[in-house]
Amino acid sequence: MAPKKDVKKPAAAAAPAPAPAPAPAPAPAKPKEPAIDLKSIKIEFSKEQQDDFKEAFLLFDRTGDAKITLSQVGDIVRALGQNPTNAEINKILGNPSKEEMNAKKITFEEFLPMLQAAANNKDQGTFEDFVEGLRVFDKEGNGTVMGAELRHVLATLGEKMTEEEVEELMKGQEDSNGCINYEAFVKHIMSV
């Protein structure tokens, strides 16, 4: 049998190249949530509570002028038992710039409606919410999570923490196997 000849097929007519796709439109900027009108907030704290809050407020005063910077508001609100996210604090503050956060100062009278706004927020997680969130990482089902995994989660998911913040939070929490009892950890966090 004779070898087959390699018959070349005529090249198909080249189709014109499609026009390049237009660049995708930039994603619309997420609108900032409107700031909370602090003047409309009714203070519901007792006189005794307000005195305690003022005492705590003054502990954060670094210059002796009875004022704090906006960057300290979240720390004081949390020290007084509330648990707002940084985004919630920014909304309460009116979404200030980084420069304003470090430069602008407020008095206790300006701070009190901010604290009340945080206290009025009902979306704060409970002990059970936090434990349930950590239970997902409990591979053994024994009430513990790996410290390294928890560090990674805290630094990369949700409202990300810096390495320094993570280390400060986890100080003294790991056992000799590098595991953390997450119920005790949540109690620790909620008491800080």
From Swiss-Prot:
GO CC annotations, alphabetized: contractile muscle fiber; myosin II complex
GO terms under biological process: regulation of myosin II filament assembly
Region Disordered, annotated ranges: 1-34
Biased composition (Pro residues): 17-29
Alphabetically ordered keywords of this record: Methylation, Motor protein, Muscle protein, Myosin, Repeat
Domain EF-hand, first and last residues per copy: 48-83, 86-121, 125-160, 160-192
Entry annotated with the keyword Magnesium: no
GO molecular function, one term: calcium ion binding
Record Gene3D superfamilies: EF-hand
InterPro entries for the chain: CALM/Myosin/TropC-like, EF-hand-dom_pair, EF_hand_dom
SUPFAM superfamilies named among the record's database cross-references: EF-hand (SSF47473)
Residues modified as N,N,N-trimethylalanine: A2
Assembly: Myosin is a hexamer of 2 heavy chains and 4 light chains.
Name recorded for this polypeptide: Myosin light chain 1, skeletal muscle isoform
Organism annotation: Gallus gallus (Chicken)
